[in-house]
């Protein structure tokens, strides 16, 4: 079934195609496996094979319809040994309820029931058949269907549903997992169909993109430095205001002293002056009443 023959509700919108092109999901590699020739649109002058995005969307919807029929979401196992897909599979698992294996796949997880990591999923989804070959081989041993994002140089051996897309770019991997998760939720009826936003799914593709741990640490350090600088500025402002208050009090005290000094005071006695000496030889003045 081609993309133009899909039901109208399942057809790709202009925004979806723009997202696929912006994330370079249509750019393959210079090598092309024989099993992937049907998904190649043309070959550029520099040798890069261009993938037909119409067939990419067709296989994406087919995989979503298969996953939506599984009653227990925990029976789906998503795997990514490629670092660019670690965050994407974890987000897919958190939104859909699937089991996520991010990082190294433990050999025997599907075949050796003695191991603690033993699982019996009904279907698995892998990011790259070349990197996740161990999981695909073990799934083939126990008859577990495999859905894989396949680049032009990937082999489709033991792969039941191959979704042609660029599986080497961080943006391409994150966007493909985002679109697959969104279609599964739409087919389940969890998310209404509509544009991304309040009327539809309010999750953006950026949440599925890979983030460099050093970049995260750098952002955390910048935030901590900004917070420390803000605290220092606040402390300096508080110290400046306190110093201004002390200066104002000191100026007020000096002004009071100046006012008191300007007020008139009583003449003080000069204890250094000698008293005027009297004449002890002079006779006392006669009494006005007369003598005896």
UniProtKB/Swiss-Prot annotation:
Keyword annotations: Cytoplasm, Ribonucleoprotein, Ribosomal protein
Q: Where is the composition biased (Low complexity)?
A: 277-292
One GO biological process this protein is involved in is:
ribosomal small subunit assembly
What is one cellular component GO term in this UniProt entry? cytosolic small ribosomal subunit
Keyword Cytoplasm listed? The answer is yes
Residue intervals passing through the bilayer: none
Q: What GO terms are given for molecular function?
A: structural constituent of ribosome
Q: Where in the cell is it found?
A: Cytoplasm
Entry-linked PROSITE patterns: RIBOSOMAL_S2_2 (PS00963)
Where are the stretches annotated Disordered?
Answer: 265-292
Q: Which family does it belong to?
A: Belongs to the universal ribosomal protein uS2 family.
Q: How does it assemble?
A: Component of the small ribosomal subunit. Mature ribosomes consist of a small (40S) and a large (60S) subunit. The 40S subunit contains about 33 different proteins and 1 molecule of RNA (18S). The 60S subunit contains about 49 different proteins and 3 molecules of RNA (25S, 5.8S and 5S). Interacts with RPS21.
- Stored NCBIfam families: uS2_euk_arch
Q: What is this protein called?
A: Small ribosomal subunit protein uS2
**Lineage of producing organism:** Eukaryota, Fungi, Dikarya, Basidiomycota, Agaricomycotina
Gene this protein is translated from: RPS0
